[in-house]
Amino acid sequence: MSSGDGQQSQALTKPSFSEVQASALVESVFGLKVSKIQPLPSYDDQNFHVCIARTKVTTDGPNECVLKISNTESSKTPDLIEVQTHIIMFLRAAGFPTASVCRTKGDNVSSLVSVDSGSEVKSYLVRLLTYLPGRPIAEIPIGPQLLYEIGRLAAKLDKTLEKFHHPKLSSLHRENFIWNLKSVPLLEKYLYALGQNRNREIVEQVIQLFKDEVMTSLSHFRECINHGDLNDHNILIVSSESAFGDAVYQVSGILDFDDMSYGYYVFEVAITIMYMMIESKTPIQVGGHVLAGFESVVPLTPVERGALFLLVCSRFCQSLVLAAYSCQLYPENEEYLMITAKTGWKHLQQMFDMGRKAVEEIWFETAKSYESGISM
């Protein structure tokens, strides 16, 4: 979703390569000819869907790729992007549906390109990944079984990354990374983007509760590497037909590892629950199914469970506040930036109105029902 560490600032420049320039990059950096190219939505980077032309030199390799051009701030952290890219490769080798990484002509996983705009020279990190099949789960009604599978996938991903090693792994300790759930108190400097209203009051209350209850509990949470952005546009699915004629969905792709950082298991499940609620007609029920799937791999401790409600509320606040702030910087990208806001404020308010105890009861009872083989 987002990528700059520290404060988001107007110094961050979102890339603005034309399709012709992007095609030229694919050829000059990766040695591949482009037959077709089209832009893909992105928060503050730039992505293109690229079809590769077959030539005598490139008879094998992928037919479709995604060209990823990082913004100027992210491009200043090549170690971090290198680690994230190697994680994608590691997970693919472990059987996860992540992209393959196309190497540059110099056999690297990324390349730094400089662009002279006349007044200054700006540098952008570029990568090329294989294009994954499927459609975002945002496009389908998600039933309990798929929610369970997504929760399970999130836990398996974090658990698998316990075995990941890289000499630059420490770059995932991203101090003050605005999208890490630990950074919720940093939202205060962006609250002006909301104006003065009920939404802002709720966010202010959540931030205060986070400081009082979560910050004091962090030492009791189990650490791990988080994907950090398992939203309904970053998980792809393909469908097939069951013996009874029903649609059966299978996860075919996990996208966008740009928000990876060290966090906690409970952060990952909270983030996943929040994003699975966005398009749901029964959002409060979602959490129990995702939690059941997650806990089938990584059972939460009582302290972690006790923080879950507030962590889900906190992720809503992060997404909603930073979207409002980013809209002021990039009004032309408003439709993409405000995806969460369409239902997010309503869901956050509903959670707040119901209160922690009532929501937890629904989540934990639903999760418990899976233990006895009855899903609610």
Curated annotation (Swiss-Prot):
GO cellular component assignments: cytoplasm
EC number(s) per entry: 2.7.1.81
Subcellular location: Cytoplasm
Gene3D superfamilies: 3.90.1200.10
Pfam families (alphabetical): APH
UniProt keyword Transmembrane helix, yes or no: no
Superkingdom of source: Eukaryota
UniProt key word Transferase: yes
Active site (UniProt): 229 (proton acceptor)
Function: Catalyzes the GTP-dependent phosphorylation of 5-hydroxy-L-lysine.
Identification of the protein by name: Hydroxylysine kinase
